[in-house]
Structure formats: C-alpha cells, structure tokens
C-alpha cells in the first residue's frame, strides 16, 4: 500500500504543473483525444523513451515510435521479464497519463527544456524501484478510464522553469480563444470533464479550419494543409512534437508554428471579405482593403480601378477643383496669350513662342471658363516659398480677365467659324503724306477694305519689305481702331528689328535661324489671337511675310503623308497655310479680319511656284511687283495692269470708279515702264489722290464724245 501511495504522490506532483501546460491546447486547436490501444502501443514517444531508458537501452533519441517499441519488446524478451516493462511504464507514464485522458496530447511539443530534464531525472531515480511498484503501475495501465486524482494545495506549486512557458501559453490561449467553442474547451480543461472536452475539441478544430482557411492559403499556399487540419495537428503533436529529446530544433519548429497560428488568428480577427464574415475573417488582400476604409467608389492605395470608374470619369469632367489660395501666399500678376495643346495649356508670357516663364493652365480651368486658344489672359500665380520644391512652370491660381473682360463674359462668345463672311464694304484708306507714293498708288490700283484677303506677289529684291512697312504705318495712322499684327516668318533678324522700330503695332516674328516648328507655332497662335479679337467685334489687320516661307515650314514640320507633289511639296503641308490665309473675312454683324500676305515668285524654286499656284486664286485682291522695274530702281515697282481688287465697286464711289477706269485705259495703252513713270510723275505734281483724279478727269477725254 505504501508503494501505491508513493506512486500516486508522484503522479500528483507531475499533474500540478500539467493544467497550466495543457491550457494552451484549446487555443491551438488540437483538442483532447483518447489514448488509442493499451500497453506499449498506447504510449507516446516520450513515454516509450523513458521505458527504454529504464531498461538500459541507449541511442533511443533518433528512433521512431515503431522501432522503439520493437527494441523494448526485444529487451523484455531477452531479459526474461516481460512484466518489468509495465512498472517502468507506470512510473514514467503515470505522471501525465490521467491528464492526457481528460484533455489534450499537445503537451510535449510545448514543454520547456527544464521540465524535460526534470522528468529525465525522475525517470532514472524511479527505475530502481520499478519492481516494487509493478502491481500498482500495471493496474494503472490496464485502466484507461481512471480519472485524475485531485491535486492538493502542496502539489499546486510548480518549478519556475515550468511556470514561465505555461504562463505564456495560458495568456496566448486566453487571447486567442475568442470563439464559444474555445471557451468551452478551456472550461473542460479546468474541470477535467472528459466528455465535455471530447465534444468541444471537434468544434474548436472546425472553428480554426474556418477562420484560418483563407489566411493560411496566402501564407502557406498549400491545399493539402487545409484538407484535414485535425489530422495534421494530431500528427504534428503526436509524432513530430513528441520528439522533444532530439534537440532544440523540434522545440523551435513548434514554437514557430505556434507563432504562425497566433498570427493567423489575429489576422482572422482583423476582418475579411464581407461574404465570409461568418467564418471569422477573410483573405489578407480584402482585410487590407477594408482596413484602409476604401470601397469600390473610391480610389485605393493599390491603384485599383474600381467598378464605377466610368461614372467617376464622367463626374470628374464637371467637378473642377479650384486652386486654393492661403492668406500667407504671395501672388504675382501674370499676363499673356493662351496656347492650348493636346493635354494642357500655357500662358505665353514672353511672346508667342514658348519661354521659361510660361504659366501652366489646366484643361479643367480652360473648360470651366470657356477659354480658347489665342485669348489674352491676366491672372496671378503663387510665389514659391523658401524650401518649397519649385516646379518647372508656375500654375495659374487666379484668373482676372479674358481679353480685357471679366472671365464669365467670355463663355457666350460666338465661334469664329460660325460667323457669316461678306465682301469688304468699309475701305481702308492708305494715303497719308503727299510724298509717300507707295500707299497712294495702292489706293488707286488695288484698294483695300476691311476683311480683304490680299496677296502681294513679289519677286526677290522688289522692295516688298518697304511696301509692308508703308502699309502698316498707313493703317495705324488712318485707322487707329484696327488692331495691327505683323507676322514675320523665316525672315532676317535685322528686318525684324527694323519692322519693330518703324511700325506702331504688334510685331510677331520667328527668324530663319529657328526651327520650322517655331515658325508654325508663331503663325498658328497669331491667327488664333486675331480670331478671338474678331469674335469680340474688333477689326484686325494681319500682315504676313511671307506665306511661301510658311508653306515651306509646314512642309518640314508636318508629318509626311506619302503623297509628294511637284517640287517636293507634301500634299498635307499646303492645307495649314491655306487655312491661315482663308481666315480673312468681313463679318456680317461686325468685326473683320484683313490679311495681306506676300508670296515669293521667280525664285528659281519649283516648290515656290507650287505654293504660289495654290494661293493664286484664293485672294480677292492682288498687288504684283515687277523685278525689271526694281532693277531700274523704279520704286514702288508696281505692275499697274496686273494689280487689282475684286468687287472694287463696293469700296469706291461711282464718280471715283469712273475716273479710275479712265486711268486704267490710258495706262494700259502704254508700256509697263512708261505707264508707271507717267503715273508717278503726275502724282508728284498733286498733293492728294482726290486732286490727282480731278486732274485726270479734266485732261482725259470721255470715250464716245467724238473728241
């Protein structure tokens, strides 16, 4: 009876540390499981190793369970005492076997090294008294359903080496056991109620399978691990976890697996897909999506396009964000011409060409304010602060005026292409001083009106630049209400300077040392600027020098179409210059655009001839210069017979028209040189064209009078 009491006392001491160790079993999901079989087959690997050590068998740390059982049986058979294995097994397994019957078998994978060492020492001491305890231990082994004896107060105290791991496992089990099944399993461990523990273990395993399914599929990526979680847990804890004596590798693997399980449980508690909320969690990707607070209508951090991206795009066209201006911002006023490109716009502050001080304008601001290419804008930009990253272009933060008016007034403007064009009706008189014969001759042979589309056909070195300057000065002197724009494309720099100093108007230039793209950019922006002024009802006069060089620039800058005309001219290169020249018109309800362009001829280039042929029939006024007269230093070298204006009867009065026709008859009968010399001589004798025409009327006989 004393031997039995000693054996029960040993089991009570071992059981005192077992509840804290086994408390983590509900959290890990293994559940309590009954011992299968009796005798050596019903023991776990650690118990078999202790039995083998009691029999004096060495080298059992690397043996499998089946091998260890065979070695023990052989040792028992060789020693002739098969019953001796039972007392040793009772001494070693009696410490934990009642506990294992009522709870879980996951103790050995989580045992601390100190606990293992203590057990090994106890097993060696009790090997000597195995014979004395044989009957009692054999009785314990043969009764698998024996309940665990109650633990007294003295046995409840465990070693510090056992308390630390079990305390950590208890806290982990408490924090992870959030489901009702886990709570029931914990209660079952505390009360040692074997039926309740057996029923709660499948529930706990099922809860872990549902909660950890999606998260573990992302972390481990194996479908086989999700098939049978309970079998995998039993195998890990029964076979792999029970090899604690093989070294620290098994302990580290078990602890790492516990940490992964804990992380998976915490991830599942974080949230998951909406359609899997009943499972306790979802995938990592959906959890991050919900944690960030984004839905399908918003734009998440991961750049997801969203289900309603088409509707959001349509709303974005109308919902324009205004630039925010703070109180401490320093605003700098800006002004310039708006140039709208494909995806953005700029205010050209330094002229009509791109510059480093241009101001960026978003397309949202363009659409909101109804801005168009060529508008003159005034506004403000924000001055960069110290330490602030400086952008390449400052953005427009405030729009003050559009073409001198409030921004809201520019939305209802008519479109230039929808305006009704008419023949010129209001005459632009170019006569100024009596000594300036160039403008006086133009008024006589080729009168110009508002909305005229005139072509100055000029061979090289015929004085076309001087004629352009004279026309520009005459327009600014006699018609100050007209907005004058002189566009010089592919010209010499000194001519640009001379034109800027001699003309009181807007000179827009792109010299020949610049690329062809600059020539086309300047011309397009200039004509768009003129159109915007015409839409407002202004009269605009554009002097272009020359349209031939503009056609050359488009031929170089425009992409090749594959259809090459005579002279190497691309078929698509002639349309932009024709669009430029065709913009001249007289508007029915007010406003006009007059364009006088020069065309080069007799240059020896087939390309120039092709370009001139395209424009020869497009104008309604033509002033032709002659190279022979220029070679003889007769200026202005105007070919009187070849020059003229269509529908000149609209611009001239009846009396003036009749006298002009008489003059043309007289000059037509003379040679070209004689005609211009006679005309210049008679005009020098008079102070004005009106006086000259009266003199012509008196001296020239009327046809049909018989004189």
Curated annotation (Swiss-Prot):
InterPro entries: AAA+_ATPase, ATPase_F1/V1/A1_a/bsu_nucl-bd, CSD, NA-bd_OB-fold, P-loop_NTPase, Rho-like_N, Rho_factor_ATP-bd, Rho_N_sf. Facilitates transcription termination by a mechanism that involves Rho binding to the nascent RNA, activation of Rho's RNA-dependent ATPase activity, and release of the mRNA from the DNA template. Residues 176-188 have a biased composition (Polar residues). Residues 1-38, 76-321 are annotated as: Disordered. Homohexamer. The homohexamer assembles into an open ring structure. Keywords: ATP-binding, Helicase, Hydrolase, Nucleotide-binding, RNA-binding, Transcription, Transcription regulation, Transcription termination. Residues 107-132, 215-265 have a biased composition (Basic and acidic residues). Its EC number is 3.6.4.-. Residues 16-31, 76-93, 153-163, 203-213 have a biased composition (Low complexity). It holds the Pfam family Rho_N. The keyword ATP-binding applies. Belongs to the Rho family. The keyword Transcription regulation applies. This is Transcription termination factor Rho. GO terms for biological process: DNA-templated transcription termination. It comes from Streptomyces lividans. Residues 331-406 form the Rho RNA-BD domain.
